């Protein structure tokens, strides 16, 4: 533990860029001004937490969030392509209607919101790699 006490925390771009500049300037101008291509500025990139609060409480780890996204995608696929669920006593009458219910719409909205967050992380990863 003595080795950890001697380390200093690396400065992040969040520490370097003033809040007023973050609000007023475009991403391109911030990139040109604060991100160095020659390594002169030694600052780490930071990631803002864009996860909705309700998902953060239920799924505190990234692994749990990705597992949730996978499960909801599979469930949505099952509900979309499997057809209606038949009642065990009456095979002629479907248990679920063909129209989307409120639960399905809520599930789709939550899945799309979480997928948008993951897509932003992946887009940022592609920007940082390029």
Curated annotation (Swiss-Prot):
GO biological process: viral DNA genome packaging
UniProt keyword list: Host nucleus, Viral genome packaging, Viral release from host cell
Subcellular location: Host nucleus
Entry keyword Cell membrane: no
One GO CC term on file: host cell nucleus
Functional description taken from the UniProt entry: Component of the molecular motor that translocates viral genomic DNA in empty capsid during DNA packaging. Forms a tripartite terminase complex together with TRM1 and TRM3 in the host cytoplasm. Once the complex reaches the host nucleus, it interacts with the capsid portal vertex. This portal forms a ring in which genomic DNA is translocated into the capsid.
Self-association state and partner proteins as the record states: Associates with TRM1 and TRM3 to form the tripartite terminase complex.
Family: Belongs to the herpesviridae TRM2 protein family.
Name of the protein: Tripartite terminase subunit 2
């Amino acid at each position: 533990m003595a080795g950890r006490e001697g380390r200093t925390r690396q400065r992040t771009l969040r520490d370097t860029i003033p809040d007023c500049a973050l609000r007023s300037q475009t991403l391109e101008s911030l990139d040109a001004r604060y991100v160095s291509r020659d390594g002169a500025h030694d600052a780490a990139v930071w990631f803002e937490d864009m996860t909705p609060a309700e998902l953060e409480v239920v799924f505190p780890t990234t692994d749990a969030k990705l597992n949730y996204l996978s499960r909801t995608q599979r469930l949505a696929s099952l509900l979309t392509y499997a057809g209606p669920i038949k009642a065990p006593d009456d095979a002629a009458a479907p248990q679920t209607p063909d129209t989307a219910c409120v639960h399905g719409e809520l599930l789709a909205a939550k899945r799309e919101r979480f997928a948008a967050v993951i897509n932003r992380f992946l887009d940022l990863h592609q920007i940082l790699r390029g």
